[in-house]
Structures are given as structure tokens and as C-alpha cells.
């Protein structure tokens, strides 16, 4: 058993990776839409597939990037927008590419996206194919082409439904915390 055993590292050879996914996590996008991601950690690599790259990953700017809690760090990063140090804003709140690949051993903060580097195409394709095969076997709607079903599930209390749309219409909104 991997939880109760004395061994470290890869204890069971079939358990050499982790699949990850995200759909809806905040109320700061139009029509309660999510930011769907699927990914796989394996060996030294993290591969991410961003499915709706036209959307803001941390929530829309006009509602305050609601997928990121307020605080001094968020404020400091937001203050870099429009400056020479804008890279911190881009990494935290900017739109993401369709594919991301990171070597988590040499780049644990995931700052250097290798997906655009031809040298890593084989690794990217290997991870993508394994991820898709496993998620297909699990009948993941996103991988099977019906991922928009996730945007139709009611996941927020009624007072927060359609928050973005109501905010943009000038409605006084309930406090978030």
C-alpha cells in the first residue's frame, strides 16, 4: 500500500503519474463559465492543456480576477500591469497558451514553457496522448467533446449565479466573504 508502506518514490510501477483537471472555480466570468484545464504530472514533467484560451484563467479583469483571493501579493502583482515588470501580471492573471509543458525538476516554479520548443515535442505528445487515453477511458466529457456540459451545472449558491453579468449590469452584488 502506498499510504501505509515504508517505501518512498514510485512504490507501484503503475502509479507513476497524476492526472489533474479543473473546470469551474470562481464566479468572475460571463455566464458562470469555467476555465477548463486537464494535465498530467509524470517523471520530471508537467503537461497542461488549456481548453478555452480566450477566457481569463483567474477570472475576468472587470470583476477583479475573483479566482485569486485579495491581499498584498495580489495587489502588488496587479500594480505591475502596464509597467516594464508586467511579466508578473502576465504569469498570474494573463491568458494562457493552449499547451504548457514544464520540467518541474529544473524549473519547479514553472516559468519556462517548453511546449513551444521543438526539442520537447516528443515529450509533449507522449504526455498528451497518455492523458487523453486515460481520460477517455474514464469518460471525461471534456476529452470526449462534450466539455461544455460543465458550464451548465449549478455550482454556486443562487445569490452568486451570473455574478459577472449582474455586476456588469450595475447590480449591487452580495459580499464575497
Explain the meaning of each model-derived region.
Residues 1-100:
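C-terminal cap/loop subdomain of S1 sulfatases and analogous C-terminal strand-loop tails that border
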Amino acid at each position: 500500500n502506498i499510504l501505509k508502506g515504508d517505501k518512498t518514490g514510485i512504490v507501484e510501477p503503475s502509479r507513476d503519474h497524476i492526472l489533474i483537471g479543473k473546470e469551474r472555480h470562481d464566479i468572475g466570468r460571463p455566464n458562470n463559465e469555467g476555465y477548463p484545464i486537464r494535465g498530467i504530472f509524470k517523471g520530471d514533467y508537467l503537461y497542461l492543456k488549456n481548453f478555452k484560451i480566450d477566457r481569463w484563467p483567474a477570472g475576468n479583469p472587470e470583476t477583479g480576477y475573483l479566482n485569486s483571493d485579495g491581499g498584498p501579493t495580489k495587489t502588488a502583482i496587479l500594480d505591475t500591469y502596464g509597467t516594464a515588470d508586467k511579466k508578473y501580471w502576465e504569469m498570474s492573471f494573463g491568458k494562457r497558451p493552449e499547451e504548457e509543458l514544464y520540467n518541474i525538476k529544473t524549473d519547479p516554479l514553472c516559468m519556462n514553457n517548453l511546449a513551444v520548443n521543438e526539442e520537447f515535442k516528443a515529450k509533449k505528445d507522449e504526455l498528451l496522448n497518455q492523458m487523453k487515453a486515460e481520460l477517455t477511458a474514464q469518460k471525461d466529457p471534456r476529452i470526449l467533446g462534450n466539455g461544455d456540459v460543465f458550464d451548465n451545472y449549478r455550482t454556486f449558491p443562487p445569490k452568486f449565479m451570473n455574478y459577472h453579468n449582474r455586476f456588469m449590469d450595475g447590480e449591487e452584488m452580495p459580499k464575497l466573504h
